[in-house]
Amino acid sequence: MRQIAFYGKGGIGKSTTQQNTMAAMAEMGQRVMIVGCDPKADSTRLILHSKAQTSVIQLAAEKGSVEDLELDEVLVEGQWGIKCVESGGPEPGVGCAGRGVITSITYLEEAGAYENLDFVTYDVLGDVVCGGFAMPIRQGKAQEIYIVTSGEMMAMYAANNIARGILKYAHSGGVRLGGLICNSRKTDREDELIMELARRLNTQMIHFIPRNNVVQHAELRRMTVIEYDPKNSQADEYRQLANKIVNNDMKTIPTPITMDELEELLIDFGIMAQEDESVIGKAAAVA
């Protein structure tokens, strides 16, 4: 069994990419479980055709404790037999959502949820912002990490930060970076830019996913593209990505870059203008 995790900036399309890729894997005959590690509990909605799956933390709060839960209450089978679990988290402004990830994964292990699987995938909230959300990396639960990014500066900044988190635990936990997934935003020279970022981070751009409105059409119906329009070229993109992950033998310890190096990269590709210190902080009328 391989345990992988999808990380990336909030709003980059991480959950959508993960669900479509896992759907493609299941279509290939792989036995898959998705563990959502986001308080929004939206990591399984396209597989289950639901708004949000009831989470481990939510059910534990209703029943009194995690020990009072039955596995079939929190683990639901969706399309292609994909097993789905959402860790969930507390109400906004109360408690630590990262604790929900820790509690849920521990419960799933003890309840035997990891038996008879080929792939377990963790869909993790945004950046590596706290120890709880870094838990799949920190405790070696996820052995390989895939970072969803794009040619936008903040998406690349987040990818570099996540690479730092992987590096921190690479020697103690054995976690490795499997590659960057470019979820295209149609920025200039995007594929070249992410390939160069990958090179500097000592990894690969494992796949470039082109922008296609069919993804949004499928999402509105709470479906993956694989199910909604299986003959669409976009469905084949996710199948290619799934196949590349299954056969990926390039798992590396990343080499994060500095913020200055990232800005230089963007300048080299013409995404960001050479900084002119004389105009910083000046309004248009003054500058």
From Swiss-Prot:
Cofactors demanded by this protein: [4Fe-4S] cluster
Keywords, comma-separated and alphabetical: 4Fe-4S, ADP-ribosylation, ATP-binding, Iron, Iron-sulfur, Metal-binding, Nitrogen fixation, Nucleotide-binding, Oxidoreductase
UniProt cofactor note: Binds 1 [4Fe-4S] cluster per dimer.
GO molecular function, one term: ATP binding
PTM description: The reversible ADP-ribosylation of Arg-99 inactivates the nitrogenase reductase and regulates nitrogenase activity.
Keyword Lipid metabolism on entry: no
Gene3D superfamilies the UniProt entry points to: P-loop containing nucleotide triphosphate hydrolases
Residue numbers of ADP-ribosylarginine PTMs: 99
Domain of life: Bacteria
UniProt record, GO biological process: nitrogen fixation
Binding site for [4Fe-4S] cluster: 96, 130
Positions annotated to bind ATP: 8-15
Record carries keyword ATP-binding: yes
Catalytic reaction equation(s): N2 + 8 reduced [2Fe-2S]-[ferredoxin] + 16 ATP + 16 H2O = H2 + 8 oxidized [2Fe-2S]-[ferredoxin] + 2 NH4(+) + 16 ADP + 16 phosphate + 6 H(+)
EC number(s) given by UniProt: 1.18.6.1
Function: The key enzymatic reactions in nitrogen fixation are catalyzed by the nitrogenase complex, which has 2 components: the iron protein and the molybdenum-iron protein.
Subunit structure: Homodimer.
Family: Belongs to the NifH/BchL/ChlL family.
Protein name in UniProt: Nitrogenase iron protein
The species this protein was found in: Frankia alni
